[in-house]
C-alpha cells in the first residue's frame, strides 16, 4: 500500500463478514470514498474523443464469434449427454445468443441434478462447436428434501411430524420424475407420483399416483373441541396433462379410493363414516410468485372442477368446483400488499362429508382447524407484508410482519353470523427448517386465538 501513488481508503469498520444484506451500503461507501479523492482522480481522466477512440480500437480488435456446427456435452453419462445435445440442437447453425443461452443453462441446472453447468466454444475436425460443461451432484439423484412440521393452530394441542420428499430423476426417460413423500408423527402417510412426458421435448405428460394417509381430523363446536377423528385415505389415480412453460399446467384425470373417519376422542353417539370415493377432475394451476413460502410479488391461480360418482355419506353423485387466487403487489423493496380470493361450491348437492374446510392458520385463522366444514364458501384476504430484518443466508431469509384482514362465509352452518371475519397479525420468517410463523387472530362471534407453525407440507 505504501508504494501506491493514490490510495482510496474505504471505511469498513462498521461492517462484518456476515453483512450480506448491507451490500448497497458498502457500495455507497466505496463511491463516497472515491468522491473524496475526485480532485486527484480527475487528473487521470481523458476527454470524450480519446475515450471514443479507445472504444473503437477495442471493438476493431474483437473477433466475431464462430457459428457452432455441433453441440457436445462433457461431465455426465452418455444417455443424459445425448438428451442435452438433443435439447440444444437448435443452436447449431445459428450465432450464439448469450442471454438466451444463459436462460437455457439455468433451466437445465434447475432440474436439480447438476452442481454446475457452463458452456464454451470448442473445435472438432476443424469445425467450431458448442461445448456444454456439466458437473453432476455427487449426492443426487435421488434428491432428498427433509420435512419438519409443527402445527400449533391449536397451541394447546400442537401436532408434530417428520418426513422427506425423495425424488428420482430421469426414470424411464429424460425429464421424467418419480416423486415420493413420506411423513410420520401425528400424521402417517406415503404418496408416490410418476411424472412422464410423452417424449423429452413434449409439453404433454402422464402422471399416475398412489397414496395412503392417516391424519388427525378435529371437530369443533364454535371454539370448543368436541371430537377428534382419524381420517384414513387409501387411493390412487392418474392424469394426462399439458405444461405451459415453467409457470402453468393443466391436468385431466380420475381418482379412486376409500376414505374412513374413525373416532378417537368423541361421544359414542357421533357417527363413524367410511366408503368409496371416486371423481373425475380437471385442474389448472398458474404460479408466477417469487416464493412458494413468503411471496412478495407475482400471482398464483388454482382452479379445479370435479365430478364425484361416489363419496362417503353422499346419497348420489355431485359436481364440485373451487378456485384460489393469490395476488401480490410490491410497494417498495421492503413492503408489499396482497389480495387473495377463494371460493368453492357443490352447486347445492349433498356431498356427504363436506369437502371444504376453513379455520387453522391460513384461512380464517381465528377459527380452529375444521371449525367451518361446508359445501359452499367464499373468502377474501387483504393485507400488508413488511420485511423487518434479513437473516444471514446460511440461516434463512427475511423476517416479515404480516397484517391481514379476512372476511368470508361458510354456508349451511346455523350458529354462525352472516359473515365470518378476523384480523390477523403474525411474524413470519424463512429458516433452514422451513417457514416459521407466530401470531394471533381476533374474529367476530368471540373467536380469538394464538397460533404458531414451523415448516410446511411439500
Features from the language model and the residues they span:
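Active-site lining segments that contact anionic ligands and/or coordinate catalytic metals
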Residues: 3-5, 68, 375-379, 396-402, ...
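A short, acidic, flexible beta-alpha connecting loop/helix-capping segment that sits on the rim
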Residues: 12-15, 22, 441-447
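Gram-negative/organellar outer-membrane beta-barrel architecture
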Residues: 116-283, 289-291, 356-362, 371-374, ...
Amino acid at each position: 500500500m505504501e508504494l501506491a501513488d493514490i490510495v482510496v481508503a474505504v471505511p469498513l469498520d462498521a461492517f462484518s463478514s456476515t453483512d450480506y444484506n448491507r451490500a448497497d451500503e458498502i457500495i455507497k461507501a466505496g463511491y463516497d470514498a472515491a468522491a473524496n479523492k475526485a480532485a486527484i482522480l480527475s487528473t487521470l481522466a481523458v476527454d470524450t474523443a480519446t475515450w471514443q477512440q479507445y472504444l473503437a480500437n477495442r471493438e476493431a480488435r474483437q473477433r466475431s464469434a464462430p457459428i457452432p456446427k455441433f453441440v457436445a456435452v462433457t461431465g455426465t453419462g452418455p444417455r443424459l449427454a445425448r438428451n442435452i445435445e438433443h435439447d440444444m440442437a437448435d443452436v447449431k447453425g445459428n450465432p450464439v445468443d448469450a442471454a438466451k443461452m444463459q436462460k437455457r443453462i439455468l433451466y437445465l441446472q434447475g432440474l436439480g441434478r447438476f452442481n454446475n453447468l457452463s458452456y464454451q466454444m470448442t473445435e472438432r475436425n476443424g469445425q467450431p462447436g458448442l461445448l456444454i460443461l456439466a458437473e453432476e451432484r455427487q449426492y443426487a439423484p435421488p434428491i432428498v428434501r427433509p420435512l419438519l412440521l409443527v402445527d400449533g393452530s391449536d397451541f394447546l394441542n400442537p401436532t408434530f411430524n417428520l418426513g422427506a420428499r425423495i425424488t428420482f430423476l430421469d426414470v424411464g426417460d429424460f425429464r421424467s420424475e418419480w416423486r415420493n413423500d413420506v411423513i410420520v408423527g401425528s400424521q402417517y402417510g406415503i404418496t408416490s407420483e410418476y411424472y412422464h412426458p410423452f417424449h423429452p421435448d413434449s409439453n404433454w405428460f402422464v402422471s399416475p399416483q398412489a397414496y395412503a394417509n392417516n391424519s388427525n381430523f378435529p371437530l369443533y363446536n364454535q371454539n370448543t373441541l368436541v371430537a377428534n377423528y382419524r381420517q384414513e385415505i387409501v387411493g390412487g389415480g392418474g392424469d394426462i396433462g399439458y405444461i405451459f412453460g415453467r409457470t402453468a399446467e393443466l391436468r385431466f384425470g380420475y381418482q379412486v379410493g376409500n376414505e374412513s373417519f374413525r373416532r378417537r376422542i368423541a361421544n359414542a353417539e357421533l357417527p363413524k363414516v367410511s366408503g368409496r370415493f371416486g371423481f373425475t377432475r380437471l385442474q389448472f394451476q398458474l404460479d408466477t410468485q417469487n416464493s412458494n413460502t413468503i411471496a412478495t410479488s407475482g400471482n398464483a391461480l388454482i382452479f379445479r372442477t370435479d365430478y364425484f360418482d361416489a363419496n362417503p355419506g353422499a346419497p348420489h353423485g355431485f359436481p364440485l368446483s373451487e378456485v384460489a387466487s393469490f395476488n401480490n403487489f410490491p410497494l417498495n423493496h421492503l413492503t408489499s400488499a396482497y389480495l387473495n380470493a377463494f371460493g368453492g361450491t357443490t352447486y347445492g348437492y349433498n356431498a356427504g362429508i363436506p369437502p371444504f374446510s376453513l379455520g387453522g392458520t391460513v384461512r380464517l385463522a381465528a377459527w380452529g382447524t375444521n371449525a367451518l366444514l361446508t359445501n359452499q364458501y367464499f373468502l377474501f384476504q387483504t393485507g400488508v407484508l413488511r420485511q423487518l430484518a434479513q437473516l444471514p443466508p446460511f440461516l434463512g431469509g427475511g423476517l416479515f410482519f404480516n397484517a391481514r384482514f379476512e372476511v368470508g362465509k361458510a354456508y349451511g352452518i346455523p350458529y354462525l353470523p352472516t359473515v365470518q371475519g378476523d384480523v390477523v397479525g403474525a411474524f413470519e420468517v424463512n429458516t433452514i427448517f422451513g417457514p416459521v410463523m407466530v401470531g394471533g387472530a381476533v374474529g367476530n362471534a368471540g373467536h380469538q386465538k394464538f397460533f404458531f407453525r414451523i415448516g410446511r407440507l411439500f
